[in-house]
């Protein structure tokens, strides 16, 4: 018989004594699931001791095979989730490259925004940068082209000024549509003290000043007879206008770079849509 200590221990641990086949007591925990019944043929083969038969049954190949299949099925089902997670968490090479480029763009734009406010490292140059900003604004260019068209006496001058006016209107429309589609916010260090802004000017991609500077520079160099120093001055002006957008914190570097690219190809579109005096007269005649 078990000692009183064994009984007290079994009572505390939540076990119940059960007589075995050899006359000894076994303690079965109530917290565990009862073992599966032993096949009667196995009992007959191994003798009358149920403990020995139960141990032999647990080591039988059938039981091992069943447990292995259940583990493999569980493991196979669990492996699907990591594969799906890997598909979600592993972006493509293009996504990684784009994220890296944007991170470099934001870092470089913040480092170059040295005139973003008066307290910046180059804050004393900010008034000059704002003057360059006005020189590339759309309103002075539209007003200047319309005035030159009105004052021009020669048909050739009127043709050039008319197409310049058309190019400026086309630039404003294309940049406004693209800004409304992309909707990229301006840099966080930008101060909204810009000259004559509209609703789409709260977005930064692409830079309208950069597109206008690149397009107007190509237009002037191809349709005006300028001396070599003036041609260099036009190119220098277009470059400074684009660079000033980053110094003032108005745009990121990629906004200006794409703006130059877009303005360069906008000029090709203007050449395709060029309005000659003959085409203009025929259009006016059709309207009348």
UniProtKB/Swiss-Prot annotation:
InterPro entries: P_Acid_Pase_2/haloperoxi_sf, P_Acid_Pase_2/haloperoxidase. It is an enzyme of class 3 (hydrolase). Residues 179-187 are annotated as: Phosphatase sequence motif I. Keywords: Endoplasmic reticulum, Hydrolase, Lipid metabolism, Membrane, Nucleus, Transmembrane, Transmembrane helix. It is found in: Endoplasmic reticulum membrane; Nucleus envelope; Nucleus inner membrane. The active site is at residues 209, 251. The keyword Coiled coil does not apply. Disulfide bonds: none annotated. Residues 206-209 are annotated as: Phosphatase sequence motif II. Residues 1-127, 183-223, 277-288 are cytoplasmic. Its main location: endoplasmic reticulum. CDD domains: PAP2_containing_2_like. Residues 244-255 are annotated as: Phosphatase sequence motif III. Magnesium-independent polyisoprenoid diphosphatase that catalyzes the sequential dephosphorylation of presqualene, farnesyl, geranyl and geranylgeranyl diphosphates. May regulate the biosynthesis of cholesterol and related sterols by dephosphorylating presqualene and farnesyl diphosphate, two key intermediates in this biosynthetic pathway. May also play a role in protein prenylation by acting on farnesyl diphosphate and its derivative geranylgeranyl diphosphate, two precursors for the addition of isoprenoid anchors to membrane proteins. PANTHER family: POLYISOPRENOID DIPHOSPHATE_PHOSPHATE PHOSPHOHYDROLASE PLPP6, SPHINGOSINE-1-PHOSPHATE PHOSPHOHYDROLASE. Belongs to the PA-phosphatase related phosphoesterase family. This is Polyisoprenoid diphosphate/phosphate phosphohydrolase PLPP6.
